Amino acid sequence: MVERYSLSPMKDLWTEEAKYRRWLEVELAVTRAYEELGMIPKGVTERIRNNAKIDVELFKKIEEKTNHDVVAFVEGIGSMIGEDSRFFHYGLTSSDVLDTANSLALVEAGKILLESLKEFCDVLWEVANRYKHTPTIGRTHGVHAEPTSFGLKVLGWYSEMKRNVQRLERAIEEVSYGKISGAVGNYANVPPEVEEKALSYLGLKPEPVSTQVVPRDRHAFYLSTLAIVAAGIERIAVEIRHLQRTEVLEVEEPFRKGQRGSSAMPHKKNPITCERLTGLSRMMRAYVDPSLENIALWHERDISHSSVERYVFPDATQTLYYMIVTATNVVRNMKVNEERMKKNIDLTKGLVFSQRVLLKLIEKGLTRKEAYDIVQRNALKTWNSEKHFLEYLLEDEEVKKLVTKEELEELFDISYYLKHVDHIFERFEKE
């Protein structure tokens, strides 16, 4: 993983020492289960726990000879625990240890992500309420549409992230399965009771039908969920990038004292953090494809998934954690320019109220086509002049026959577009 995007506590979860500690935790859970079932002598687990040490360099040195990391680990621990080594890794295959340990890591990573995502939700909710009644222009196709509330825009982000909390909870549940079922998953050399007890100690459930491995659809679901969360963050980042354009300048991401925007142009304040989030979201999607490829392994298992997972598990979880933490800081500290929002609403000289005029003319008895033609005719004049849309309407003979000056002016009241904002917030809170 690129150190630039690695943050504690997530990065600490994926160190070599942490990996071997999880392996040892799985092995000890198995010996404890054997003990409790009376299948090995009492005291074995405690002695192994006291004598086994995580020696990364020793394991790597042995692996140079064995070319097998789990064998190197078993031999390394075996050299430390004397006679008890005959009960260590008893009846197991490498994937019993690897897959179960990976589940422990992914569950723990998921919990870290979940906690940070909930904090992000809290920030989004606070910002949404702060700007609940702040008018801003809504844009469709990048073009001014109708006024809306900036708080409502942020509420949409919050709503999506709340759904992502639920998705992530489901993804954690999806990978909360281990397997202690032997070489092809049929418990030939390790009884199911050992698996049940060992996994219960670890807080995991037995994979209902395993092969030599836990089926990889679980991991694909998990990584796909992480990519969906990242895409939601990207949506927020892209919106902020658009709103920070010089011509728009309604929102700006945080810009620290002493920060530089360009090596050549001192005036620049670029949305580099949101651009970074956009790029990292692309990487998150890239992790999904190989995880889907991992589902179709040969027969009861091949090892093609292993090299993929050494990359994607640590990288995807660390990348998303960085994205969530960074996005939280951006939204918490972004500058919201309410005056610029008002100025931008006025930029099109009242054209954003065209639908209200259309509906008023229909209300007065015109067909939709007749009303549309009148409104569009005056709107197109406005596009190409400095006059306000209302002025053209007040001069239009067809309009004057149907609508009074007071009625027309009332149609340009911006509060009309915010009248149901409180209802939307209240409805959302009830869900």
Curated annotation (Swiss-Prot):
It catalyses: N(6)-(1,2-dicarboxyethyl)-AMP = fumarate + AMP; (2S)-2-[5-amino-1-(5-phospho-beta-D-ribosyl)imidazole-4-carboxamido]succinate = 5-amino-1-(5-phospho-beta-D-ribosyl)imidazole-4-carboxamide + fumarate. GO terms for biological process: 'de novo' AMP biosynthetic process; 'de novo' IMP biosynthetic process. PROSITE patterns: FUMARATE_LYASES. Its EC number is 4.3.2.2. Pathway: Purine metabolism; AMP biosynthesis via de novo pathway; AMP from IMP: step 2/2; Purine metabolism; IMP biosynthesis via de novo pathway; 5-amino-1-(5-phospho-D-ribosyl)imidazole-4-carboxamide from 5-amino-1-(5-phospho-D-ribosyl)imidazole-4-carboxylate: step 2/2. It comes from the Bacteria. SUPFAM superfamilies: L-aspartase-like. It is an enzyme of class 4 (lyase). One of its GO terms (cellular component) is cytosol. The active site is at H141, S262. N(6)-(1,2-dicarboxyethyl)-AMP binds at residues 4-5, 67-69, 93-94, 212, 263, 268-270, 307-311. Keywords: Lyase, Purine biosynthesis. It holds the Pfam family ADSL_C. One of its GO terms (molecular function) is N6-(1,2-dicarboxyethyl)AMP AMP-lyase (fumarate-forming) activity. Belongs to the lyase 1 family. Adenylosuccinate lyase subfamily. PANTHER family: ADENYLOSUCCINATE LYASE (PTHR43172:SF1). Catalyzes two reactions in de novo purine nucleotide biosynthesis. Catalyzes the breakdown of 5-aminoimidazole- (N-succinylocarboxamide) ribotide (SAICAR or 2-[5-amino-1-(5-phospho-beta-D-ribosyl)imidazole-4-carboxamido]succinate) to 5-aminoimidazole-4-carboxamide ribotide (AICAR or 5-amino-1-(5-phospho-beta-D-ribosyl)imidazole-4-carboxamide) and fumarate, and of adenylosuccinate (ADS or N(6)-(1,2-dicarboxyethyl)-AMP) to adenosine monophosphate (AMP) and fumarate. Homotetramer. Residues from neighboring subunits contribute catalytic and substrate-binding residues to each active site. This is Adenylosuccinate lyase. It comes from Thermotoga maritima (strain ATCC 43589 / DSM 3109 / JCM 10099 / NBRC 100826 / MSB8).
